Amino acid sequence: MSADIRFDSLKTIVPAVSRETADRLIAFEDLFRKWSKAINLASPSTLADLWNRHILDSVQLFPLAKEATRWLDIGSGGGFPGIVTACFLAERSGGCIDLVESAGKKAAFLRTAAGHLHVPARVHSARIESMWEKIETPQVVTARALASLGDLFTLAEPWLSDGAKALFQKGRDYQREIDESRVGWSFDLVKHPSAIDQASVILEISNLRRKTD
């Protein structure tokens, strides 16, 4: 896929995307492919369609909170959506994203990617729970393919209950996860359809509170 085709595909999601951001995302794809030969950053079956399946899918989040400058991505894995978001924040004065990833090799890749792309990302090789008191409450918390919605609430509760908004990407079972999570939690919800996968959504969560008997 040529750079121009990838740039045009980006503009279908973020019409005002700059060429500089597009170049960073293309460079990230190239770096991801190189590292994937040595460590498992994503399912091998998805690498053939890496641009659409992972990068464009992650791009969708930034326009939903484009005014935010302080982001946090938990369980960052191979950098989706964390490094992708960082590519957009690179052109935002004061923008920064914290990436939390417990797997050492993946955290090493994230650090390499952040440095290679010159993006404002801080990588924490640690368990999410250990960062509750170390990372200041961001404006937005993101997660992709990490855990069930209820478990995500538990992992991100210190930040979400302090005013942060969540953007969680979910697959075809999202409604079941929503229903199950409402047993123990109250929250405001906006469902954004995915532009990449018709069976998926982005759940925008705010005002999270744990229910008490």
From Swiss-Prot:
Main location: cytoplasm
Entry's transmembrane regions: none
One GO molecular-function entry: rRNA (guanine-N7-)-methyltransferase activity
Superkingdom to which the source organism belongs: Bacteria
Subcellular location: Cytoplasm
Recorded GO CC terms: cytosol
InterPro entries in the record: rRNA_ssu_MeTfrase_G, SAM-dependent_MTases_sf
Record-listed S-adenosyl-L-methionine binding positions: G75, F80, I128, E129, R144
Function recorded in the entry: Specifically methylates the N7 position of guanine in position 527 of 16S rRNA.
The protein's name in its UniProt record: Ribosomal RNA small subunit methyltransferase G
